[in-house]
Each structure stands twice: as C-alpha cells, then as structure tokens.
C-alpha cells in the first residue's frame, strides 16, 4: 500500500451521499476500522524500519572504522573498507552520505508521511458523526419549513 492508494481510497470513502445520511452514519465504524488497520500496519512497518536503520548505522560505523571481522563482512555482503579511517568528528558526514542509510531513511520518512496522512483521515472520520448529525438536523429543519 502506498500514499497514492490511500488517497484514492479516501477520495471514495469520504463521499457522503445527502440522500443516505443514515446509512453513511452506520458505515462510519467500518470506515474507521479500515483506516485504523492501515495505521497499525504503517506504525509496525515504521518501528521495524527504525530498528533496521539503527542496526545498519551501527554496522556502518564499525565498517568505516575497520572494526568488522571478515565473517561479519561476508555475512553483510560487504567488501573491506580500504580508504583512510575517518576521524570521530568526520563519522557523521560519512554516515549521512552512505547510500544504504540514505535509502533506509527515505523509507522511514515515507512511512512517517503515510502515518501523518492516516492520522488526518482518522481525524476526519471522528468528525464524520458530527457532520452527519448536522446534515440530518438540517434536513429536518428544511422539511419543517416546507
């Protein structure tokens, strides 16, 4: 599931038919369950990705310092680092420029954006009952004046 798919689903799910406000009201729980399930999945993926990032960062730190054993390098599928070992004050620059870490950080930021989108959708779903109630009241008032 990606952001565009979630947005597309919400475009369909957010539509409230004025002629079927009662049905829309009873559908709110189903719609909420759908998006809360997505939110939980995204949060779990985000937690896993953050843990992967921390482990990769630790291994990259050791890699650039030349502290990984031959077995660890083989297990990670990396060649030994052949350049000059960076000083401690240079290490952040090395890690920030590492493509593997950049890729994983990009994934984390994408998942955070998905979470932000889902939080917004869930907020709208919470407000939906209020909107439906107002719509029903408005229709009652309109009928009373006819």
What annotation goes with each model-predicted range?
Residues 46-85:
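Extended alpha-helical coiled-coil "stalk/arm" regions
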Residues 35, 39-42, 105-109:
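Amphipathic, heptad-repeat alpha-helical/coiled-coil signature enriched at exported N-termini
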Residues 144-146:
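Conserved small/polar residues in nucleotide/adenosyl-binding loops
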Residues 46, 50-55, 95-138:
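Long amphipathic alpha-helical coiled-coil segments
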Residues 72-112:
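Short, glycine/alanine-rich amphipathic alpha-helical segment
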Residues 140-142:
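Acidic, proline/serine/threonine- and glycine-rich low-complexity intrinsically disordered segments
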